[in-house]
């Protein structure tokens, strides 16, 4: 994490794991949307209709809000019933139980930004109650293998048996400890960013990363050049904010799955940094504690919001020519539109569609060397409760904290399907693996 630099011509290169410089020449939920409902409405609904029905009525009001809608797939906070919003009727429908419940539960969890479904079951609406929902959707089981969203494979039906699907998704994006608020560019504290990990090669911190689960880490592809591909020399450190903390949990690396479209790995002379994304599969699973927790992915179709202030964290250099931070740093920076970031005063058309910029036009606070691969997270409540989502991966930039040269990030929402496919396809792989 860097303060403003003294070298206006400097680039984010470095001898360890620098961010490479580029070459020269139907309504979606938004990252960090925050639904707001008056306490009077909530209290009235709870009193008049009961908690179950009120919860869905409240969610319906939020989803229909013109400003900050909830996501159209939700889990009931009471009994984990999976429900989908019917925009035509303006109501929630349950998913009729089928032989494909496991796959449907997995698709629903993934669509909401959870990594996977941990369990599923079914309930009878006649005994469990409708709880504010109205009717059913049935699943076209033949379309499931290619479906990316539940809406791709569901239609209104009668569901004669009256049995509906429930699901338990892997929890994510929530702190387990109460924390104080810190405003950018300062030391962090234990438990604030429990998904942040340190990737170290021969004991040296080279990159950051984000826990998606106890055994999968998302980071940047450029952290693994040819010189750093002996996986037995990599270690992943989690559960600490001080780089020398004796309390950190460390594990080895079984496999690295990197994007086959990351061009510098094909030809080192290429300076085009699209697809700068990689998954690290750990040799075993980390214990999840109040200091070690996974982050959520963006929900399917979730868009970035220009101007939204989110948080980047890392142990990178505090200045371009400075030393790496000994304590995890955090900074709140706003998302900059690609139109602005591609203007001649900024990066002049070097920002590709699957990238985005974040920072202040005047500079002053930014990610830097050693922050590469680390998380850019945004908080929202589109899943009914406040969660942090991994919206970006620290990728590249010119200098550190320079005016009109903000940090550039891999746009995670554009790689959701790549992530899910890589995890399912390469869970038993070892070594360096390419995923198209």
From Swiss-Prot:
Residues 1-29 are annotated as: Disordered. CDD domains: Tryp_SPc. Disruption phenotype: No visible phenotype. Mice are viable and fertile. They present no defect in blood coagulation. Likewise, they present no defect in liver regeneration after liver resection. Mice have severely impaired hearing, with abnormal morphology of the tectorial membrane in the cochlea, but no visible defects of the organ of Corti and no loss of inner or outer hair cells. Mutant mice have reduced levels of thyroid hormone. This may play a role in their hearing deficit, since adequate levels of thyroid hormone are required for normal development of the auditory system. It catalyses: Cleavage after basic amino-acid residues, with Arg strongly preferred to Lys. InterPro entries: Hepsin-SRCR_dom, Peptidase_S1_PA, Peptidase_S1_PA_chymotrypsin, Peptidase_S1A, SRCR, SRCR-like_dom_sf, Trypsin_dom, TRYPSIN_HIS. The keyword Disulfide bond applies. Glycans are attached at residue 131. GO terms for molecular function: serine-type endopeptidase activity; serine-type exopeptidase activity; serine-type peptidase activity. Residues 73-170 form the SRCR domain. Pfam families: Hepsin-SRCR (PF09272), Trypsin (PF00089). PANTHER family: ACROSIN-RELATED (PTHR24252), HYALIN (PTHR24252:SF7). Belongs to the peptidase S1 family. Serine protease that cleaves extracellular substrates, and contributes to the proteolytic processing of growth factors, such as HGF and MST1/HGFL. Plays a role in cell growth and maintenance of cell morphology. Plays a role in the proteolytic processing of ACE2. Mediates the proteolytic cleavage of urinary UMOD that is required for UMOD polymerization. This is Serine protease hepsin. It comes from Mus musculus (Mouse). The gene is Hpn.
């Amino acid at each position: 994490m860097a303060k403003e630099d003294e070298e206006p011509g400097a680039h984010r290169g470095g001898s360890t794991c620098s961010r490479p410089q580029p070459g020269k020449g139907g309504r979606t939920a938004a990252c960090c949307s925050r639904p707001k409902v008056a306490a009077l409405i909530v209290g009235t609904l709870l009193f008049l209709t009961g908690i179950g029905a009120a919860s869905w009525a409240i969610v319906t009001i939020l989803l229909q809000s013109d400003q900050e809608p909830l996501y159209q797939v939700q889990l009931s906070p009471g009994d984990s019933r999976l429900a989908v919003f019917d925009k035509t009727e303006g109501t929630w429908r349950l998913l009729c139980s089928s032989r494909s419940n496991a796959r449907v539960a997995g698709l629903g969890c993934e669509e909401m930004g959870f990594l996977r479904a941990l369990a599923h079951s079914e309930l009878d609406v006649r005994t469990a109650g409708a709880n504010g929902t109205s009717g059913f959707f049935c699943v076209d089981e033949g379309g499931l293998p290619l479906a990316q969203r539940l809406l791709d494979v569901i239609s209104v039906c009668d569901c004669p048996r009256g049995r509906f699907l429930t699901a338990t998704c892997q929890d994510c994006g929530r702190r387990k400890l109460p924390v104080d608020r810190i405003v950018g560019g300062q030391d962090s504290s234990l438990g604030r960013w429990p998904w942040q990990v340190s990737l170290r090669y021969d004991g040296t911190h080279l990159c950051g990363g984000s826990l998606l689960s106890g055994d999968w880490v998302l980071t940047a592809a450029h952290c693994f050049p040819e010189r750093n591909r002996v996986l037995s020399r990599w270690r992943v450190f989690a559960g600490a904010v001080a780089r020398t903390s004796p309390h950190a949990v460390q594990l080895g690396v079984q496999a690295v799955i990197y994007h086959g479209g990351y061009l510098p790995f094909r030809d080192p002379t290429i300076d085009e940094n699209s697809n700068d994304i990689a998954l690290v599969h750990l040799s075993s699973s980390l214990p999840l504690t109040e200091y070690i927790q996974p982050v959520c992915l963006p929900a399917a179709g979730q868009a970035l919001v220009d101007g939204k202030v989110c948080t980047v964290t890392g142990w990178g250099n505090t200045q371009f020519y400075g030393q790496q931070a000994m304590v995890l740093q955090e900074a709140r920076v706003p998302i900059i539109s690609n139109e602005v970031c591609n203007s001649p005063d900024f990066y002049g058309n070097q920002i590709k569609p699957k990238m985005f910029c974040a920072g202040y036009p005047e500079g002053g606070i930014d990610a830097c060397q050693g922050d590469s691969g680390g998380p850019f997270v945004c908080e929202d409540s589109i899943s009914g409760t406040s969660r942090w989502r991994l919206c970006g991966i620290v990728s590249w930039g010119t200098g550190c904290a320079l005016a009109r040269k903000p940090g550039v990030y891999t746009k995670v929402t554009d790689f959701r399907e790549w992530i899910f496919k890589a995890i399912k396809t390469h869970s038993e792989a070892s070594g360096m693996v390419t995923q198209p």
